[in-house]
């Protein structure tokens, strides 16, 4: 039991959230560099050179230079075991990202300091807010001409409704970026360009006054005034407020040049929480219980061309995973032997011998495991809070070869089980409607249907703009509703009744006329 406690105390499981192009994949690479997980960082933009970022591994990602599917990377840092869940930065893959945030204990928010807080980051922060997830912030790209740092803090506080506690402070920006000043240890770290691919021992000077010559007189005078202002106007770091999700420690730097990342990582591994207890429908599960429990938050098909398999990403919530153990599948009521669970390094797979609360392991899945499934060592527990989000874009699927209808249905349902798209079968037609949160997912589905299921399809427009899941406790009212609105009703891939609305006005009218019917934008898996 002591071993379990020791291992849990080491774990830090988190995701990175940001707007596309804020530098998330770059910062991921630098963390792996510091954790000795990779030897040199591949720069993300240089896709054509064959140096692909480690965490972008699906063919389409390599072609387009974006992270589509969530990768999981485990590496050691400062005596801790870091589980980093890399989430898609591209806005088309937000559903996958939202769900990943249910499997972490904290998050790192990367802000492009040139642009400030952007739309996508706001959406992701709102998901973090649902669970009061502790957030660490990294203001990136200070080797470029950025917004004023005080203005950036104000913007985060104003839009994200979270207090900011700057841990260090940038000295200049762009061509005049000289480094950062540690507000708590009175230490200056001086910036030099050109060390993005390696770990470089940047020069440190104890005491702000001792760095005046290196900073330059004019910039130094401005800096002193700015620091006085920051100390007076900003919040001090408070561990309790941070753990409640009320305050975020803020670090400044430039991930591309590998500057400021180490300081942020040191702070993160010090302050971020170890794995936390989790709610189930039956009771609270504590991490130090000796029986294994956990849930599946993602399914990824064909992670490896050689294996043609599907992997369920399983977050351990308590106990210890040991190779070859039998676990109980709560939804099916069956026992299942796990002999070859995997640990990940972005597409590089290794068999895992053991795992503890906070770890993410991969279970081989031949179609029996779904997103949201819970596993235990026998107790009937169902973990809460793994959401399905209503899609925002819809298309009708057109099959090029009508004889392949069965293969198309199978492919669409299997791909929808991964959670990036959803399939709807209207009550009164044989159409298949595909829904997604972003346009790019339709390309991904067409490409994967062709390569994995040998089915060619195309899309056409469909008169649907919103989807809402329908719930009602009164069976008679629900049946009346079904008869009256059958033209708008479909069943999703999991068999849930869904209202597909052509317009927002149509949806509002249906809601107004049916106060006893719940129209929900999310449903639990």
From Swiss-Prot:
Q: Please tell me where this protein is predominantly located.
A: cytoplasm
Is Iron included in the keywords of this UniProt record? no
Question: What's the stated role of this polypeptide?
Answer: Increases the formation of ribosomal termination complexes and stimulates activities of RF-1 and RF-2. It binds guanine nucleotides and has strong preference for UGA stop codons. It may interact directly with the ribosome. The stimulation of RF-1 and RF-2 is significantly reduced by GTP and GDP, but not by GMP.
Q: What is the lineage of its organism?
A: Bacteria, Pseudomonadati, Pseudomonadota, Gammaproteobacteria, Thiotrichales
Q: Does the keyword Cell cycle apply?
A: no
PANTHER family, per this entry? PEPTIDE CHAIN RELEASE FACTOR RF3
Provide the protein's localization: Cytoplasm
Keyword annotations for this protein? Answer: Cytoplasm, GTP-binding, Nucleotide-binding, Protein biosynthesis
What family does the Swiss-Prot or TrEMBL record give for this protein? Belongs to the TRAFAC class translation factor GTPase superfamily. Classic translation factor GTPase family. PrfC subfamily.
Q: Which residues form the tr-type G domain?
A: 9-276
The lineage's top-level taxon is Bacteria
Q: Name one GO molecular function term.
A: GTPase activity
Residues reported in the UniProt entry to bind GTP: 18-25, 86-90, 140-143
Q: Which GO terms describe its biological process?
A: regulation of translational termination
What CDD domains does the entry give?
RF3, RF3_III
Protein name listed in UniProt: Peptide chain release factor 3
Which Pfam families would you find in this protein's record?
A: EF-G_D2, GTP_EFTU, RF3_C
- Gene name? prfC
């Amino acid at each position: 039991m002591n071993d379990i406690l020791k291992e849990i105390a080491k774990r830090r499981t988190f995701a990175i959230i940001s707007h596309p192009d804020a530098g998330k994949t770059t910062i991921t690479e630098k963390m792996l560099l510091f954790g000795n997980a990779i030897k040199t960082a591949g720069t993300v933009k240089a896709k054509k050179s064959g140096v692909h970022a480690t965490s972008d591994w699906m063919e389409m990602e390599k072609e387009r230079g974006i992270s589509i599917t969530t990768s999981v990377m485990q590496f050691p840092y400062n005596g801790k075991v870091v589980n980093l869940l890399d989430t898609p930065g591209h806005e088309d893959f937000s559903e996958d990202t939202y769900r990943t945030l249910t499997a972490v204990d904290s998050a790192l928010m990367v802000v492009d300091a040139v642009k400030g807080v952007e739309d996508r980051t706001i959406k992701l922060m709102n998901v973090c807010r649902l669970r009061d997830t502790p957030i660490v912030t990294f203001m990136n790209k200070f080797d470029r001409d950025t917004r004023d740092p005080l203005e950036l803090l104000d913007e985060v506080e104003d839009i994200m409704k979270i207090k900011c506690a700057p841990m260090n402070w940038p000295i200049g920006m762009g061509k005049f970026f000289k480094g950062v000043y540690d507000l708590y240890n009175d230490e200056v770290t001086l910036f030099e360009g050109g060390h993005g691919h390696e770990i470089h021992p940047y020069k440190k000077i104890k005491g702000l006054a001792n760095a005046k010559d290196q900073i330059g007189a004019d910039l130094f005078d401005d800096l002193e005034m700015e620091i006085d202002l920051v100390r007076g106007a900003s919040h001090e770091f408070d561990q309790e407020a941070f753990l409640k999700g009320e305050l975020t420690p803020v670090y400044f730097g430039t991930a591309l040049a590998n500057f400021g990342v180490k300081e942020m990582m040191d702070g993160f591994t010090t302050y971020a929480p170890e794995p936390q207890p989790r709610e189930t429908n039956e009771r609270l599960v504590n991490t130090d219980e000796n029986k294994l429990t956990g849930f599946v938050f993602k399914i990824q098909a064909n992670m490896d061309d050689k294996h043609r398999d599907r992997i369920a990403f399983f977050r351990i919530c308590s106990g210890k995973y040991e190779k070859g153990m039998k676990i109980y599948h709560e939804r099916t009521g069956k026992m299942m032997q796990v002999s070859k669970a995997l640990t990940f390094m972005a597409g590089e797979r290794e068999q895992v011998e053991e795992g503890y609360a906070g770890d993410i392991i991969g279970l081989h899945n031949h179609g029996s495991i779904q997103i949201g499934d819970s596993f235990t060592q026998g107790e009937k527990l169902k973990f809460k809070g793994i959401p399905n989000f209503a899609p925002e874009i819809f298309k009708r699927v057109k099959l090029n070869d009508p004889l392949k209808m069965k293969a198309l249905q199978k492919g669409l349902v299997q791909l929808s089980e991964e959670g990036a798209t959803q399939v709807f079968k209207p009550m009164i037609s044989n159409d298949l409607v595909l829904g997604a949160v972003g346009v790019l997912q339709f390309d991904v589905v067409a490409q994967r249907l062709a390569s994995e299921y040998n089915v060619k399809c195309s899309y056409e427009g469909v008169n649907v703009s919103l989807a809402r899941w329908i719930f009602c406790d009164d069976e008679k009212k629900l049946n009346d509703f079904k008869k009256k609105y059958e033209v708008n009703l479909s069943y999703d891939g999991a068999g849930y009744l869904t209202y597909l609305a052509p317009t927002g006005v149509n949806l509002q009218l249906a809601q107004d006329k049916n106060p006893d019917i719940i129209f929900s934008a999310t449903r639990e898996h």
